[in-house]
Amino acid sequence: DVERLQFSDKKVALDFSANALETLQFIGVIAPALQGNLNVRGTVLSLFDQGKSMQEMSQLALDLGLITSDNTALAKTVFKNVFNTTADPDQNLTNALVEFIEQNGDAKFLATVAGLNINVDLVGLQQSGMEFI
């Protein structure tokens, strides 16, 4: 199976059930405004291609300060990122998310939410692949 195509100006990942999908899942949770950035896609994809897990990538994002590590702020930020909203989740949902973070850790929380495929265009990815540089 062909997983990657290379052109003179860009590359296309066709492995929509593996690393390309994880790349978009990860970016969608951490920084959805960067989902269209081909350089960011390429960098993240290369880390997944090197064998990094979603949880390792999530921990890296936390270590680099790419996303807050305060439990309440993390819960609210991820909610806003995934659902593309400026509104905070209601207090009950915030409390449930914070409880998950406290019990499982912030990297596990990010990895779990990323795996939900909420903020990923699966149809577009399957039809045309994921462009990156």
Predicted regions and their residues:
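Substrate/cofactor-recognition hotspot
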Residues: R4-I133
